[in-house]
């Protein structure tokens, strides 16, 4: 497969720069297994799912992970906390650092009262750092000193609005440097309607790292390597998925991160409870085992996220739907509109 196989033309003005208000006021492109696409509102989602279907959310919480501070010399430094090492909101992190000169091991960086000691350089701008606090104290320090790490295609400074809107309403586990954006459309009213219809829900956790935005280098898709991310499937989620399968209902993943979590946790014919790290690269040819339908946003041309969606819905059908969405002026990427896809195979 060539990278160019996953390209499409997108006018810059269709890249959503602000969230819609309210959250569920977005559009929904429905791509069934067969037949023409439908153009609906996201508020129609409960009517498009069946009683007994199971929605699987990612309950990770975006942290204000972008820090701007100084080195002991007074020079400016930026740090993006990418992945907690050891689980939870601990003190050791993998981070991306940017300064006028390479940051030396042993250097202590200062961020409005929060200190980070550089323990090791991993190359390509990545470092292992130890912060001077953890848990609730760290969460409070990041709320004060950190900024929400908006994606690079949102060409404005983060605002206080983003602290609320670049976060799902069910976010529970702090640790992500990017939001699981398919979940941003859901409101309490939508969840109540889903419950009234008999649609069930559960949650898994995958802490999204900045690798989600890194481009595929070269034109050969097979040579790309994903950055590993931490995930967890709790026993109650595994049990809910098994019960859904047993009654013949659909597992509906909310977002590509939920797909990667469930496919990574597949063991011996079922989704297994447990925690680990996954670098699973889902692309056309992947045999999906855990997921029947997918709610997702529109993704960047040539991105690994688009490749996952093409693998799930069929490359030709998905790219045709994207071209249709462009023609109909859908809004794209993190703050954009959504799709509901049935699995192609």
Swiss-Prot record:
Q: In which pathway does it act?
A: tRNA modification; tRNA-queuosine biosynthesis
State the protein's name. Answer: S-adenosylmethionine:tRNA ribosyltransferase-isomerase
Q: Does the keyword Transferase apply?
A: yes
GO MF terms listed in the record are: S-adenosylmethionine:tRNA ribosyltransferase-isomerase activity
UniProt keyword annotations, A-Z? Cytoplasm, Queuosine biosynthesis, S-adenosyl-L-methionine, Transferase
Give the species this sequence originates from.
Anaeromyxobacter sp. (strain Fw109-5)
- Report the main location listed first in the record: cytoplasm
What family is this protein classified in? Belongs to the QueA family.
């Amino acid at each position: 497969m060539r990278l160019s196989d996953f390209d499409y033309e997108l006018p810059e003005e269709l890249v959503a720069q602000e969230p819609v208000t309210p959250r569920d006021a977005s559009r929904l492109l429905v791509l069934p297994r067969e037949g023409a696409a439908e153009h609906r509102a996201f508020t129609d989602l409960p009517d498009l799912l069946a009683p007994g279907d199971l929605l699987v959310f990612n309950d990770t919480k975006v942290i204000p992970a972008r820090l701007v501070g100084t080195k002991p010399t007074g020079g400016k430094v930026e740090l993006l906390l990418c992945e907690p090492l050891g689980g939870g909101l601990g003190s050791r992190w993998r981070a991306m650092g940017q300064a006028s000169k390479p940051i030396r091991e042993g250097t202590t960086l200062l961020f409005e009262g929060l200190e980070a000691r550089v323990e090791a350089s991993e190359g390509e701008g990545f470092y292992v750092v130890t912060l001077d606090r953890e848990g609730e104290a760290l969460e409070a320090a990041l709320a004060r000193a950190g900024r929400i790490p908006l994606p690079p295609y949102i060409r404005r400074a983060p605002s206080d609005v983003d602290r609320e809107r670049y976060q799902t309403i069910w976010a529970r586990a702090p640790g992500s440097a990017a939001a699981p954006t398919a979940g941003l459309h859901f409101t309490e009213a939508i969840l109540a309607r889903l419950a009234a219809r008999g649609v069930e829900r559960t949650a898994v956790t995958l802490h999204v790292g900045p690798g989600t935005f890194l481009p595929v280098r070269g034109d050969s898709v097979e040579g790309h390597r994903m950055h590993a991310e931490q995930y967890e499937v709790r026993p109650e989620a595994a049990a809910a998925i098994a019960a859904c399968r047993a009654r013949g209902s659909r597992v509906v993943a909310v977002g590509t991160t939920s797909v990667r979590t469930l496919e990574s946790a597949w063991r011996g014919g079922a989704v297994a409870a447990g925690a680990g790290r996954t670098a699973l690269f889902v692309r056309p040819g992947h045999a999906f085992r855990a997921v029947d339908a997918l709610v997702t946003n529109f993704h960047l041309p040539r991105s690994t996220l688009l490749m996952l969606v093409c693998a799930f819905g069929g490359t030709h059908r998905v790219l045709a739907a994207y071209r249709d969405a462009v023609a109909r002026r859908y809004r794209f990427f993190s703050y954009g509109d959504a799709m509901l896809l049935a699995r192609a195979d």
